[in-house]
Amino acid sequence: MSIHMAQNAFARCAEKVNTRKNLTLNRQAVGEVVSYCTMIAANDTLDFNRDKQERLCTEMNHRAEVYTVEMSAYGQPKAREKLRERTAPMLDKPFVLPAGQYPRKQREKDALAERRAAGDLVIRFFIEALDSMGYDRAQINSTVEEARKNYEQFLEWAKDGE
């Protein structure tokens, strides 16, 4: 193997590691933004006060912990399936995180898939939290739609550099 081939192989491996690291950071950042969008949506549509905001946050964290335990017990695919089974009956239509720009390259498509997976998890924790707080299907759906709109607004601000 020539030195040039070895350097190229090393560069490809380093790029893969950086891509995985970036996807993980991307997933975490989107999860945080979607969490903020849900909190704002709950405040706007359900007229939350500080106590309800704190309870919602606690309930969402609890649902995330339940999911983590299920992942450890059953593996990620089965844990996701169980989460979808619990939350799907409460949704009128599937939640799909807005894309912003259409992805052209494979790494952009991978990043969008990661963002959508993170957004899906947060929204499902949000749905379970609202359900446990006694909100009905119509209230949950209107609040989820408001959270989606909030995320679209965030994308506009990000595009404008605000």
Briefly describe each language-model feature range.
Residues M1-A41, V66-F126, Q153-E162:
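Intrinsic disorder/low-complexity detector
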Residues T38-M39, R55-C57:
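Hydrophobic, well-ordered secondary-structure scaffolds
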Residues A41-A42, L46, E128-A129, M133:
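Extracellular/lumenal glycan-associated surfaces
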Residues L56-Y67, T143-E152:
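Amphipathic alpha-helical segments that form the core helices of the histone-fold
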